[in-house]
Each structure stands twice: as structure tokens, then as C-alpha cells.
Regions:
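Long terminal accessory regions outside catalytic cores
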Residues: 1-93
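A short, well-structured beta->alpha microelement
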Residues: 149, 186-201
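Short helix-loop-beta junction
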Residues: 178-188
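Short, acidic/turn-prone active-site loops that include or flank metal/cofactor-
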Residues: 195, 214-218, 236-241
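Short, charged, surface-exposed secondary-structure boundary motifs
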Residues: 201, 220-225, 241-248
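Proline-aspartate-enriched helix->loop->beta-strand connector
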Residues: 206-208
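Ser/Thr/Gly-rich flexible loops in soluble cytosolic domains mediating phosphotransfer, phosphorylation
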Residues: 232-270
Length: 274
């Protein structure tokens, strides 16, 4: 495990940095080191699905007496629709669960389920907030689930064009080490100051895959924005001095992700394909 996991954050000053749009409300309070897994997002996802199923059951139960006044068979038809909805959502959740933990594509429709995933994220954040779970914790777990799905649904591509997007808040030492990867791997590396510039770079370079390094908030926004167009893997940065200043990244994780797309230069067999 990377030594970065042991870093503890220090007190920080709001005025000594240029905060990104996602951190405008930050008050300088120390951040806790985020240590959550995929299970947090999946647990609240299950909660969202169960609540939606229960809501429909209660709704149809309450309006059935009125439905029968319009057409005698209408309540039966409504219950059949509810049953099918529950069956589909249960089956889809099982697909999501198995795909995430096995990192193999178990979805009936093999493409990345971006639309359903997007709908689920919005509901999960609302539910998690009610239970006092921070947006950053949910975001971190969401990114890990999204990464697993990206790996599982990745299609073989011998001419992979990988774009690595970096935040400008990385330390110079860290940035230099990442730039050195360009001498080893066939990748494009760009530093961007925000989502608008990131989208501009994506349109300009037209990659087949994107590796993003950023805080959870920016990663979630980016995945939701372009995750349905091509493969995206996000790597949360490490913020020993708070957000948007002298951040780090797990270089081992970043290099492993690059190898996932373009392969290991020591291995001429090509990119890693599940």
C-alpha cells in the first residue's frame, strides 16, 4: 500500500490558494484522510433501489381502489408493471454488484451503463447526506465503483490514445515525475485548471481513454460529464495541505492505470484486456 495513505492533513489557510469551483465553500478546516471502499456507494445504491421499489408498491396499493373504477383489470396491470420494475432493478443491481467486485462485464447490455449510473449517483448523494455521510466520502466510493466498471467494460483497442489530465495544484516534484512517464508510455499529459479547460483538451486531443487526477469532487463532475463517451478512470489526489495546494498522487496507482490501457513496455504482448 502506498505511503501516501499515512499522510495526515495539516491546518490550512483559505487565502493562500486559488480554490476551484468545487471548493468555494471550503472554510480551511482540516480534511480527514478518506479511506472508503466501493461498498459505501453500493450500500446506498441498494438503499435507493429499495426505497424506489417500496414507493411504487405503496403508491399502487393506495390508488388501486380508484384504478378499478376506471377499468376492472387496471390494478392487475399496474401490479404487473411494478413487479417487472422491481425485477429489473434487482437484476440490474446484481449486475452492478458483481461487475464492480469481479471487474468483469456482467451487464446484459455490454456497454457502460452511464445513464443509469448517473441517475443512481444523484439519488445516492441525497440519501447519504441524510445519514451524515460527506459528499467527499461518497464521491471517493463512487469513483472506485466507476473505475471498476470502466475496467470491466473496456473494449480491446490496439491503438489506444490515452490522455492523462492533471490538476495544477500538484507539487512540482510530483508533476515532473508524471511528465517523465511520457518518455516511457505513449500517452498525452496535460495540466488543467478546471472542468472547462479539461473538456476543451478532451475535444482537442480526442482520446479513446482518459485518466484523471483530481479531488473527488472534480473527478465525479468529470465522470458524470464525459464518462458515457469513452473509458474514464479517476485517481483521487492526496491533499496534505488541504484542497488546491501542493497535492500529491499515488504514482504507483497512476502508472498501473497507464499500463492497463497501453500495456507494460517490458511486455510486448500489448495492453491489458480483460
Amino acid at each position: 500500500m502506498s505511503h501516501f495513505k499515512e499522510i495526515k492533513n495539516k491546518s490550512s489557510d483559505v487565502n493562500d490558494r486559488n480554490l476551484g469551483d468545487e471548493w468555494i465553500d471550503w472554510n480551511g478546516k482540516d480534511e480527514d484522510v478518506i479511506k472508503v471502499g466501493k461498498g459505501l456507494f453500493l450500500l446506498f445504491s441498494l438503499g435507493v433501489i429499495l426505497i424506489s421499489d417500496l414507493f411504487l408498491v405503496v403508491l399502487i396499493y393506495m390508488i388501486s381502489p380508484r384504478l378499478v373504477t376506471y377499468f376492472e383489470e387496471l390494478p392487475s396491470a399496474a401490479w404487473i408493471m411494478v413487479f417487472l420494475y422491481v425485477l429489473i432493478t434487482t437484476f440490474w443491481y446484481l449486475e452492478l454488484l458483481i461487475t464492480t467486485y469481479r471487474e468483469k462485464n456482467f451487464f446484459f447490455f455490454k456497454s457502460r451503463p452511464h445513464f443509469h449510473f448517473e441517475w443512481l449517483y444523484i439519488k445516492v448523494v441525497k440519501l447519504a447526506t441524510l445519514f451524515g455521510v460527506s459528499k467527499d466520502n461518497i464521491g471517493n466510493s463512487f469513483v472506485k465503483v466507476s473505475n471498476a466498471i470502466s475496467k470491466a467494460t473496456k473494449k480491446p483497442n490496439k491503438s489506444e490514445k490515452v490522455l492523462v489530465l492533471l490538476p495544477r495544484c500538484l507539487t512540482k516534484t510530483e508533476l515532473k515525475k508524471i511528465m517523465d512517464f511520457k518518455q516511457i508510455y505513449p500517452i498525452e499529459v496535460c495540466t488543467v485548471s478546471g472542468g472547462e479547460l479539461a473538456r476543451k483538451k478532451v475535444k482537442e486531443i480526442k482520446p479513446t481513454a482518459v485518466i484523471g487526477v483530481a479531488c473527488e469532487r472534480d473527478l465525479v463532475a468529470g465522470i458524470r460529464d464525459v464518462g458515457g463517451n469513452f473509458s474514464v478512470i479517476g485517481i483521487p489526489n492526496i491533499r496534505p495541505n488541504g484542497p488546491c495546494k501542493d497535492t500529491n498522487v499515488d504514482l504507483e496507482e497512476l502508472e498501473d492505470t497507464i499500463k492497463f490501457y497501453v500495456g507494460d513496455p517490458k511486455n510486448q504482448s500489448g495492453p491489458v484486456v480483460d
